[in-house]
Amino acid sequence: MRTLTTALVLLTCTTARPIAAQWHIGFDLAATRYGGSSHDTSNSHVASQGRPGDATAVGLRVSHTWRRYGVALRAAYAKPGLAVAGQSVNLTDKTTGDLFEIGALVNTRVAGIGPSGAVRVELGPALHLWNFDGDARARVSAQGAAVYEWPITGRLGGAVRLEGLLSPCWFDAGDVPPEFERRVTWRYSVGLGLRYRL
């Protein structure tokens, strides 16, 4: 009897370990929209705002979870370009403005939906390298997201992600005319992703 009990305990421990701590790799596709960055304080220009343009971001991530908590490392690429906007104009120059970013995130599960879906909240810093006319601008931002994850089949899962980001202005002082005021650059995005459990 003691041998059977020991065998059951060992079997339970070995099967619970992969569930308790799991590695995932993932692919994300997100629609991003930027705001802030610079504003015409004189109201003398038709286009009163200058900012990164809206773009589609492609990302890869590696994450590790322990039951309720987790960490992730994410890298992404997009080409937002440079946008100028006003009341009756919205122009985007896509010949410049490549964006590379890498972020570290911590997350926690805040709710469950259905038998195996989960809602997580993620927070962390990100480093952005915005290549503006051949000059790479490095900015550190704060990002936060709400993520809904659900199983698709076997080891494959899906995710919907709503993200917000705040960063110092992506323009340097010499990039904008004197009548333009530099402001915080902000971004929000909506994305879909796939997660594969290793």
Spans of model-derived segments:
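Surface-exposed strand-loop-strand hairpins of Gram-negative outer-membrane beta-barrel proteins
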Residues: 32-58, 137
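Predominantly the C-terminal beta-signal and adjacent terminal strand-loop region
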Residues: 38-40, 47-48, 79-83, 144-198
